């Protein structure tokens, strides 16, 4: 029986501020309305593996699915094979493992005089009927932050013949991700 794992590593460098938020249910008065997810040990921003997996799967589904998958289990065979399938009637674990991407260029940014690795962006929405403003504060990882990306691909007997095809899809997904945005507010220049 063949069994192996292939580790794919890369770096994600932010071209713009990135917001992947967390709950602010217990925020103190005056705190940021929407903080970013941070590593509890270093207090530095991270990119959750679930965000990378979800965004990549979503982008690939537009290319590889015959129609938009509205529920678990409606993805085509290749995406189900790579990302898994949560459908009750045909549950299947995927071949890919996405690790959390940790912030790795603290020293580089320190040498440039950076004092904080996140920024708070003030935004405002205006009610179209009442013209009432709704200001809010959104925390973002700053541009030029670098995160260590790691993806694990599992090879088994059943997948051995499909490795080349799978990696073509993975590379397509990485390219699509590079050309799109990650996190919230992408249409407003984030991520």
Go through the PLM ranges and name each one.
Residues 1-126, 130-191:
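RNA-binding basic/glycine-rich loop and surface signature characteristic of RAMP-family CRISPR effectors
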